[in-house]
UniProtKB/Swiss-Prot annotation:
NCBIfam families recorded: cyt_tran_rel, nicotinate (nicotinamide) nucleotide adenylyltransferase, PRK00071.1-3
Transmembrane segments: none
Keywords: ATP-binding, NAD, Nucleotide-binding, Nucleotidyltransferase, Pyridine nucleotide biosynthesis, Transferase
Pathway stated in the Swiss-Prot or TrEMBL entry: Cofactor biosynthesis; NAD(+) biosynthesis; deamido-NAD(+) from nicotinate D-ribonucleotide: step 1/1
Reactions catalysed, as given in the entry: nicotinate beta-D-ribonucleotide + ATP + H(+) = deamido-NAD(+) + diphosphate
Family in the record: Belongs to the NadD family.
Function: Catalyzes the reversible adenylation of nicotinate mononucleotide (NaMN) to nicotinic acid adenine dinucleotide (NaAD).
This protein's name: Probable nicotinate-nucleotide adenylyltransferase
Keyword Amino-acid biosynthesis belongs to the record: no
Organism from which the protein derives: Caldanaerobacter subterraneus subsp. tengcongensis (strain DSM 15242 / JCM 11007 / NBRC 100824 / MB4)
EC code: 2.7.7.18
Length: 209
């Protein structure tokens, strides 16, 4: 009998996408033997209202450039095509419709995002619709993640797993600040993405205010 499809969903603002995202997605794919990982650039992320997020077309194209060499990676425009704020619950429901009820979904998040899951829209429904994978991330204490995982497991059962991924202390915020200050971003993200940033003169203005 064929086994059910297992899909990883890697959500993010990807402003810009970097090696921290890619190494995390690949490590989780391997650990859970996922058939593929779908990167989903956020359209209008509700938690990032404090700063101007780069045009979604740029973020989508950079995500494509970064993932193109991995046969297991795909990019979905599901969230950037949606008007208004985008919520994970709506995205997962749409994927369920597309792939069928039997497909297992693993939503991949870094440790910082894990600490916020319970505040997400319809968190209880979401935790029943898909598994969550909490990837370690430099700067976020292991203990803190374990505590949060315990809390979630007590409420919802075995729906969340922790995966240790090769530590890369890279963030999009740091990359944007580097570009604004004229400092190098080489080796932090794939070269085509670096070229794209230069070509369209992204992040030239310091937006860290
Ligand atoms: P920003 O600094 O703008 O918040 P970011 O680097 O955190 O950007 P996001 O697009 O916010 O990137 O992250 C998408 C997902 O990837 C989140 O779940 C985040 O925790 C995870 N992630 C980002 N960078 C890393 C990293 N270096 N290691 C592990 N996980 C990461
Ligand atoms: Mg972030």
């Amino acid at each position: 009998m064929e086994r059910e499809l297992r899909l990883g969903i890697m959500g993010g603002t990807f402003d810009p996408i970097h090696y921290g995202h890619l190494v995390t997605a690949e490590a989780v794919r391997d650990e859970f033997k996922l058939d593929k990982v779908i990167f989903v650039p956020a359209g209008n992320p509700p938690h990032k209202v404090k700063r101007k997020v780069t045009d979604k077309k740029h973020r989508y194209l950079m995500t494509i450039l970064a993932t193109i060499t991995n046969p297991f990676f795909e990019v979905s425009s599901i969230e950037i095509d949606r008007e208004g704020y985008t919520y994970t619950i709506d995205t997962i429901k749409e994927f369920k419709k597309m792939y069928g009820e039997k497909t297992l979904f693993y939503f991949i998040t870094g440790a910082d995002a894990v600490l916020e899951i319970l505040t997400w829209k319809n968190a209880d429904e979401l935790l029943r619709l898909c598994y969550f994978v909490a990837a370690t991330r430099p700067g976020i204490e292991g203990n803190k993640i374990d505590q949060e995982l315990d809390k979630i497991r007590k409420l919802y059962g075995d729906v969340i797993y922790k995966v240790t991924v090769p530590s890369l202390a890279i963030s999009s915020t740091d990359i944007r600040e580097r570009v604004a200050k004229g400092r190098p971003i080489k080796y932090l993200l794939p070269e085509p993405v670096e070229r794209y940033i230069q070509k369209y003169k992204l992040y030239k203005e310091d937006d860290s205010r």
